[in-house]
């Protein structure tokens, strides 16, 4: 199975963080699965790293490097991914929670027919079958 990691899942995975569930660890470590991180996540890490509101010390360069060292493949953003975002049903998602990172990551997974691994309880509100909650 091809699996795209939500940004927080990728961060938890590369840091071996205790928030990463057993199910997530099993899916990520399964040799039959191919694991991807997105260029969008690199951008999200950059913004969070530079924001005084966050205490993320991980730089975007470190994030990308550690993901690659963990055996994850990078998924680049394409026009197809952006256009797929318009097919997401946002009607059940509160306006203040319509995170553009979430929408683009989910649309990437949908466009590529990948599963999307997340712990974000708002993601299932989009109703996409590709979502795996962990």
Functional labels for PLM-detected ranges:
Residues 57, 69-119:
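Active-site neighborhoods of divalent-metal-dependent phosphate/nucleic-acid chemistry enzymes
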Residues 111, 115-117, 121-134:
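Charged phosphate-binding loop/patch that engages nucleotide di/tri-phosphates or the phosphate backbone
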Residues 36, 75, 132-133:
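General small-molecule cofactor/ligand-binding pocket signal
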Residues 45:
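Phosphate/NTP-binding elements of NTP-utilizing enzymes
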Residues 1-37, 53-65, 121, 126:
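Short, well-structured N-terminal submotif of metal-dependent ribonuclease cores
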Residues 16-17, 48, 88, 129-130:
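Residue-level signal for well-ordered alpha-helical positions
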